[in-house]
Each structure stands twice: as C-alpha cells, then as structure tokens.
Swiss-Prot record:
EC number, as in UniProt: 4.1.1.50
Post-translational changes noted in the entry: Is synthesized initially as an inactive proenzyme. Formation of the active enzyme involves a self-maturation process in which the active site pyruvoyl group is generated from an internal serine residue via an autocatalytic post-translational modification. Two non-identical subunits are generated from the proenzyme in this reaction, and the pyruvate is formed at the N-terminus of the alpha chain, which is derived from the carboxyl end of the proenzyme.
Name assigned to this protein: S-adenosylmethionine decarboxylase proenzyme
Record carries keyword ATP-binding: no
Lineage: Bacteria, Bacillati, Bacillota, Clostridia, Moorellales
Amino acid sequence: MRALGRHVLAEVYGCSFEILNDIKKVEEIMVKAALEAGAEIREVCFHKFSPQGVSGVVVISESHLAIHTWPELGYAAVDVFTCGERVNPWDACRYLTEKFKAADVHATEIERGVIEPPQAAAVNL
C-alpha cells in the first residue's frame, strides 16, 4: 500500500489578531511556509473579509496550502496537502504556526490516494 499524498489538517489557536487579520502578512507567511517546505509555487489567491478574517490558497506543484482565519478568536484552520516524497507538509505547518505566534496547535496527518497493490501494479507504483 502506498499513498499519493500527505494532508496535514491543523487547528491553530492563540494566534496574533493583528497577523491573522492582515491579508498581506497572512499571504506572505503562507507563501514562505510553502517555500520552507521546498514546494514550487504556481498560484496565490487571498481574500480579506469585513469586518475581519482572511482566506487564501497557495497552489503548489505538489498540491496546496489553504487557510481560513478568525482573528477575533485567534484561530486559523490550515490545510497543507503535498503529493510525492520531496515536500514535507510538517515543515510548512511548523513554519506558519511559529509566524502566527500560535499558543496551541492540534494537527493530524491523513494519507490521500492510498493505492492498494492491484492498483499500484497497474500504474507501476
């Protein structure tokens, strides 16, 4: 059995209101997190909500990083999904939680695209 990708889902608490509510800072941190993990960036799209909050995605060759922030709660929901063996999603997750000044993080990893032996043989995995 082999997985096509690794998906880290992070619940990030106790973050700086100012950072989570600043679209430029959130985008910069997410882009740098992707680069810290060794990913190749393809597209970046972020949106600022009123009265507060930021959502965005960094599309990488290896998949994506996504975020939704609730600055008033000091909370961010973060996904880091990478395909292949070259990029470690935990490197990106560690970087961004540090930069958001998180007090607490609950993260889990799930395997995506688990390929069983019959499928693996069909596609030479």
